[in-house]
Amino acid sequence: MEKYEIMFIVKPTLQEAAIKKAFEDMKKVLTDNKATITEEKEMGQRDLAYEIKKHNTGYYFLLVTEAPVEAINEFNRISNISDTVIRTLITKLED
């Protein structure tokens, strides 16, 4: 399994409970696909560098995980079709 850093941004228009649920749902995608989350961080609401899907701010989340490629592919697929996640960045970390 490889080590990855995943940062994703959730819509700022959601209620607090919906934001937490989106974070838990995205973590569940990884754990259901045999990934181990080694670090998680809620970075809060921040300004975006440029407008994304008509939003100027978003709630940032960071996950560091050891995961098989299939788990990362599934996370990417789910985040792309999610109506709550507006941007995802997945970076493979070197040991």
Regions found by a protein language model. Give the residues of each.
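Structured, basic alpha/beta domains of bacterial-type, RNA-associated proteins
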Residues: 2-95
